[in-house]
Amino acid sequence: MFYDTAKIYVKAGDGGNGCVSFRREKYVPNGGPDGGDGGRGGSVILVGDEGLNTLLDFRYKRHYKAPRGEHGKGSNRHGKAGENLYIRVPVGTVVKDEATGEILADITEHGQEVVVARGGRGGRGNAHFASPTHQAPKFAELGEPGEERWLLLELKLLADVGLVGYPNAGKSTLISRVSAARPKIADYPFTTLTPNLGVVEVGEGQSFVMADIPGLIEGAHAGVGLGHQFLRHVERTRVLLMVLDMSGFEGRDPVDDFEVLLKELKLYNEQLLTKPLVIAANKMDTANAQENLEKLKQHIAGKYEIYPISALTGEGLKPLIYRLWEIISTLPRESLEVKPQKVIKEQPEEGFVVEKVDGIFVVKGKKIERLVAMTNLDNEEAVDRLQRTFTRMGLEEQLKRAGVKPGDLVRIGKFEFYFVDETEGLEEE
């Protein structure tokens, strides 16, 4: 079964907690703090794999979590970093943030790695917080939480030649004739509901990839007949091979079919018409085929190359395949990379902003959110340090400028506090 979309949840590992420890050694009564740092959490990394051609695996497993870093230990021993979690995806996968719809990455090469969730920083041990005025700190930092998000994966096939045409035009028969692909073939429309890939051997060491795109109908550019899902794959092909039914079956007119297909490609993405386009006039073994072929040639008037074929009998396939190979050989290997957009707006490392949202004063800033997340709010010394840091950063002043009053809720990251007053500052909810 072919799956070309998937939704998965990724969670990077939290950083390990810093350690609270004091040196204990014979004849050294005041050894001082020696708590080590926690290790960094593992990141979640997507890796392009040319051996995969479907997102089927993500139908059965949707949640992925990297291990956290180890906690720090006494004697200044640091925790081990968590191992990164590597998830293999097909080449041609576009990765989007589910919450924003923005593009994180476009995986276009085998072995390409993309970090989609970064592991949290390890917390610092109490040895870091010793000073001449505070020689025995009894607190350490917690590990920073790892990033987490839902991702939308969208597979766009990477193929040299893409077959486009109406349902039942003979595309599946064609690809089964020229490659080892074995798509479902039957005498009714929409037999092919998922793309099929086949490798076409031209000569010794020479081959190209052909994609059988499910049939298009009028209105496909607007999503009619699952058109958006099918046309998405055409974008990644280097050459378009339009397969037209010359038999005139059920009153079909190859000239009309040609014009409708051309229009659908243009309306979906005008850039598709800049690709080389070759026409395969199929089913030339039928009664009215030659007459319809002459009409098509007159209509096109040499604008596109036409190759009369019969996918059923194999007639005319060899010249068509060699011509496709000639065209492919002259085309440069274009970069198919989609320019990633910023998934999260860059926040200043030092600064922060205060916004009032639904009656709650929300503080946003990379450093201040990390500071709160890595503070052990059950430890009085750690909370005192947090309060002093807030004062140095000017948090209370900014909250007052935003209109905060005693008793109002203040949210920083995932934590909420009650604003008390100028002297007491913030009190955890």
UniProtKB/Swiss-Prot annotation:
<feature type="binding site">
    <location>
        <begin position="310"/>
        <end position="312"/>
    </location>
    <ligand>
        <name>GTP</name>
    </ligand>
</feature>
<feature type="binding site">
    <location>
        <begin position="190"/>
        <end position="194"/>
    </location>
    <ligand>
        <name>GTP</name>
    </ligand>
</feature>
<keyword id="KW-0378">Hydrolase</keyword>
<dbReference type="InterPro" id="IPR036346">
    <property type="entry name" value="GTP-bd_prot_GTP1/OBG_C_sf"/>
</dbReference>
<dbReference type="GO" id="GO:0042254">
    <property type="term" value="P:ribosome biogenesis"/>
</dbReference>
<dbReference type="Pfam" id="PF01926">
    <property type="entry name" value="MMR_HSR1"/>
</dbReference>
<feature type="domain" description="OCT">
    <location>
        <begin position="344"/>
        <end position="421"/>
    </location>
</feature>
<dbReference type="GO" id="GO:0005737">
    <property type="term" value="C:cytoplasm"/>
</dbReference>
<dbReference type="Pfam" id="PF09269">
    <property type="entry name" value="DUF1967"/>
</dbReference>
<feature type="binding site">
    <location>
        <begin position="165"/>
        <end position="172"/>
    </location>
    <ligand>
        <name>GTP</name>
    </ligand>
</feature>
<feature type="binding site">
    <location>
        <position position="172"/>
    </location>
    <ligand>
        <name>Mg(2+)</name>
    </ligand>
</feature>
<feature type="domain" description="OBG-type G">
    <location>
        <begin position="159"/>
        <end position="329"/>
    </location>
</feature>
<protein>
    <recommendedName>
        <fullName>GTPase Obg</fullName>
        <ecNumber>3.6.5.-</ecNumber>
    </recommendedName>
</protein>
<comment type="subunit">
    <text>Monomer.</text>
</comment>
<keyword id="KW-0479">Metal-binding</keyword>
<feature type="binding site">
    <location>
        <begin position="282"/>
        <end position="285"/>
    </location>
    <ligand>
        <name>GTP</name>
    </ligand>
</feature>
<comment type="function">
    <text>An essential GTPase which binds GTP, GDP and possibly (p)ppGpp with moderate affinity, with high nucleotide exchange rates and a fairly low GTP hydrolysis rate. Plays a role in control of the cell cycle, stress response, ribosome biogenesis and in those bacteria that undergo differentiation, in morphogenesis control.</text>
</comment>
<keyword id="KW-0547">Nucleotide-binding</keyword>
<dbReference type="InterPro" id="IPR031167">
    <property type="entry name" value="G_OBG"/>
</dbReference>
<feature type="domain" description="Obg">
    <location>
        <begin position="1"/>
        <end position="158"/>
    </location>
</feature>
<dbReference type="GO" id="GO:0005525">
    <property type="term" value="F:GTP binding"/>
</dbReference>
<comment type="similarity">
    <text>Belongs to the TRAFAC class OBG-HflX-like GTPase superfamily. OBG GTPase family.</text>
</comment>
<dbReference type="InterPro" id="IPR045086">
    <property type="entry name" value="OBG_GTPase"/>
</dbReference>
<dbReference type="GO" id="GO:0003924">
    <property type="term" value="F:GTPase activity"/>
</dbReference>
<dbReference type="InterPro" id="IPR015349">
    <property type="entry name" value="OCT_dom"/>
</dbReference>
<keyword id="KW-0342">GTP-binding</keyword>
<feature type="binding site">
    <location>
        <begin position="212"/>
        <end position="215"/>
    </location>
    <ligand>
        <name>GTP</name>
    </ligand>
</feature>
<dbReference type="InterPro" id="IPR036726">
    <property type="entry name" value="GTP1_OBG_dom_sf"/>
</dbReference>
<feature type="binding site">
    <location>
        <position position="192"/>
    </location>
    <ligand>
        <name>Mg(2+)</name>
    </ligand>
</feature>
<dbReference type="InterPro" id="IPR006073">
    <property type="entry name" value="GTP-bd"/>
</dbReference>
<keyword id="KW-0460">Magnesium</keyword>
<dbReference type="GO" id="GO:0000287">
    <property type="term" value="F:magnesium ion binding"/>
</dbReference>
<dbReference type="InterPro" id="IPR014100">
    <property type="entry name" value="GTP-bd_Obg/CgtA"/>
</dbReference>
<dbReference type="InterPro" id="IPR006074">
    <property type="entry name" value="GTP1-OBG_CS"/>
</dbReference>
<dbReference type="InterPro" id="IPR006169">
    <property type="entry name" value="GTP1_OBG_dom"/>
</dbReference>
<dbReference type="InterPro" id="IPR027417">
    <property type="entry name" value="P-loop_NTPase"/>
</dbReference>
<dbReference type="Pfam" id="PF01018">
    <property type="entry name" value="GTP1_OBG"/>
</dbReference>
<keyword id="KW-0963">Cytoplasm</keyword>
